[in-house]
Amino acid sequence: MFLRPKHIMLSALQRFRLGACAVLCVWLLAACALEPADDTPADSKPTANDDRLLILCEGLWGMNNASLSLLDHGVLTNHWFRQQNPGERLGDTANDILQVNDTLIAISVNWSNIVQYIRPDGTAIAATENIPNNRRMATDHRGYLYVTSYADHGYVAKIDLTTKLVVDTCHVGYEPEGIAYYDGRLYVANTGGYSTQTQDHGYEQIISVVDAQTMRELRRIDTGCKNLYGKVAQWREWLCINAAGDMYNTPPHTVVLNMASEEFRVFDFPSTYCCAAQGRFYCLGSAYSHLTGKYTFSTHTIALPSLSASEGLAGYSAAEPTIASMQSPYALYISPRSAHMYASDARAYATNGYVYEFSPTGTLLNRYLLRGVNPSVFVAL
């Protein structure tokens, strides 16, 4: 594991919670502290592979600068959404992107309070505009999209993808985050992340199980782990959930849930940035402590179905020194086509980020400079 001092790291969630004071700070930061990164060339030549990936950049909260980049067979196109939709912006603080089917991609744009829909060629076609403070998404591949929302004490919205209208909702725990669909049920990880601001509830440690058809909460699974924050990773019936802890005396953990049996196992390391590939969960953990003022990063692999955990990124160990050298690791992804690993570096959280590409053995192939801030989610086309 490796450490980062407090003064160079600030998570997107912490920025989001700073309220009105943060708006002023972000504007000052954007005006005064942006590094002159736009003219920096990519570090290596394009790599010939079969990957065609979208890279979602959150942007800065309140700055309306979320963006989408296309990495097509090793060739990077920045501001791809704006290129395909002249005069349009993606919005403010994009949290998630999901390919619903062969013709439709959904993007959750949190502070714009919309779910934006685009075709695989990038052209915008519609939006759902009445889900405030939307976060993460899942689909049943049967014509419905499910979106978590921090609003109204926490709920899940069900969208009919034919009409793009919300047709039902279900209240779950406070500040629901990650969501997954399995066998007619939704599994929703609740964080309770606003607890330190609102003072009316604590951190959540439950997974809500929701009937996707009736949109009624069936039961709650108590994981015993606080603050189930972040995007979940799914491999068939297995779900990997990060539990961030309280950043004081309760350390972070990882919860792996078998959605078929609803049994789970807890691991004593975080999985802040996690992906599923080749029957494994690959976990890049980021643990912040208010007591030390430092972030601790770690890498682990969880094999399925044995649930055996090991340190490092199995098969990609050669990539670990590069990831350890990143200023602010922010996303991890393995292509289902090429088995290439991609990792992003948000750097100072207010500058253009980098994406690193590694071979199936972890050899560094490319470093791409994005024209976007906080690259957080990849999706393969």
Label each residue range with its predicted role.
Residues F2-C21:
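Bacterial N-terminal signal peptides that target proteins for export
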Residues A33-L381:
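Predominantly soluble domains enriched in secretory-pathway, periplasmic, or organellar proteins
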Residues L28-A31:
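C-terminal motif of bacterial Sec signal peptides marking the signal peptidase cleavage site
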Residues C21-A22, A48:
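A generic structural signal for short, non-catalytic loop/turn and secondary-structure boundary residues
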